[in-house]
Amino acid sequence: PEELDEDEFDNPLGEGTGAGVIFGATGGVMEAALRSAYYLVTGNNPDADAFQSVRGLEGWKEASFDLNGTTINVAVASGLGNTRRLVNAIKKGEVHYDFVEIMSCPGGCINGGGQPYKEDAVMVEERRHVLYGLDKRDNLRFSHENPSVKQCYEEYFEKPLSHRAHEILHVK
């Protein structure tokens, strides 16, 4: 048999960050986005755990954060019943948020249909704890520092919040 030279594995999905890992838990998308929003507003990275008040298994969670003098009001909903209550409250004008995260599965993807089924909340909490542990140990904890994301902006989108990025990445 022919011998092949040793080589590095290719990385078809690019590099990941701790911020990407926590997407699997309710509040993780919000926390990752707030980390990068803070950077975009201030030019500095926040403490990576500065926004942990959006974490948890509560069905509907609210928080406010000061980003360089601007208050950002956010909500995180977990489970479709809580999502319905949140959406109805927004439609009625009872609440206002600048950013909302919705996770269909209670607790997030860590409790979704692709996971082994377990009725007790202890398993969901343990899974959540594992994701945040992986985030803490990752050298890259901020989405905006992901080399693959940076390359996309440099080569295609020009810069974060550019007109091109807005047209392609944002929904109406």
Residue map of PLM features:
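Iron-sulfur (Fe-S) cluster-binding modules
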Residues: 1-172
